[in-house]
């Protein structure tokens, strides 16, 4: 198999290393020539993904920011042809899918939205690993949910990455869920660490602090773009969170022990309902 990868950051680099280890040919493109050169020297990338080589790929993975992914397919879509399956790996889906489904139809290539649910707080090719996606979920957003043959083909093409499960959904549902499961967590973590007390935490912190602050270490430009593209769903989640926090605050202001116990018990029960013990 020949795999084309656009963007050699953490996600694109991990795909490159995974497919290379599985014995496949990897062509890649990155706007940073030094990153591309390093990927070639490391052996993960076999050559340049050019306009001339796009049509020879079996799979093309677009692992760059959402707006850049759309721009790339607008500029190069005419050179892809019918052979490759194109999957973007962006963290939001509505903007990309709304633009790229029509582009795929116009230029005659096969496209699906995708979101590999894996990563670390580090970014860049040097942190990429061939096992990044092992047993991780992969979300797919096809134009036609009933195209079983295509979905089977996609799962086969993605097999070398080692995903544990695939979820098929719409761009709308993906973005609504991601606002809660990922984006809200990043906002809360990033805001939490801004407390003046944070600088004094050593010797007083353990697992709770580490859990709350892990994703505060993020790529600001990427996450800002993702937040703004999904601001309707994310702002709704923020409204819910702030309303809930005000209830805890009000209970403390009024020394309402029974009320505070009730709120905490509601949260404990909700966690059990959602995830079990």
Language-model features, listed with the residues they occupy:
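Short beta->alpha hinge that forms the Motif I/post-I loop of the SAM-binding pocket
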Residues: 31, 64, 89
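Alpha-helix C-terminal capping/helix-to-coil transition sites in glycosyltransferase folds
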Residues: 55-56, 135
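Interdomain hinge/lid region at the active-site interface
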Residues: 200-270
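N-terminal Rossmann-like NAD(P) cofactor-binding module of classical short-chain dehydrogenase/reductase
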Residues: 60-61, 87
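Rossmann-like NAD(P)(H) cofactor-binding subdomain of soluble oxidoreductases
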Residues: 74-126
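NAD(P)+-binding Rossmann beta1-loop-alpha1 motif at the extreme N-terminus of oxidoreductases
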Residues: 1-51, 55
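Internal alpha-helical scaffold of NAD(P)-dependent oxidoreductase catalytic cores
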Residues: 130-214
């Amino acid at each position: 198999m020949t795999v084309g990868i656009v963007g050699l950051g953490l996600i694109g680099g991990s795909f490159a290393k995974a497919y290379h280890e599985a014995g496949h040919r990897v062509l890649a493109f990155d706007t940073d020539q030094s990153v591309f050169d390093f990927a070639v020297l490391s052996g993960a990338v076999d050559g340049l993904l050019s306009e001339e080589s796009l049509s020879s790929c079996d799979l093309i993975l677009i692992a760059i920011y959402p707006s850049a992914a759309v721009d790339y397919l607008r500029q190069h879509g005419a050179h892809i042809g019918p052979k490759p399956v194109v999957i973007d790996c962006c963290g939001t889906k509505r903007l990309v899918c709304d633009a790229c489904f029509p582009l795929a139809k116009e230029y005659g290539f096969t496209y699906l939205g995708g979101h590999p649910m894996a990563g670390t707080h580090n970014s860049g090719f040097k942190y990429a690993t061939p096992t990044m996606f092992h047993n991780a979920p992969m979300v797919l957003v096809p134009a036609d949910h009933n195209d079983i043959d295509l979905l089977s083909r996609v799962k086969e093409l993605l097999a070398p990455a080692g995903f544990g499960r695939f979820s098929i959904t719409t761009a709308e549902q993906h973005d609504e869920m991601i606002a809660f499961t990922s984006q809200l967590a990043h906002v809360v973590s990033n805001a939490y660490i801004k407390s003046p007390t944070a600088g004094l935490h050593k010797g007083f912190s353990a697992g709770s602090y580490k859990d709350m602050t892990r994703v505060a270490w993020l790529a600001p430009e990427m996450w800002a773009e993702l937040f703004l593209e999904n601001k309707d769903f994310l702002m709704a989640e923020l409204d819910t969170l702030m309303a809930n926090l005000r209830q805890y605050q009000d209970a403390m202001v009024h020394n309402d022990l029974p009320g505070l116990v009730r709120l905490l018990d509601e949260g404990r029960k909700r966690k059990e309902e959602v995830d079990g013990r």
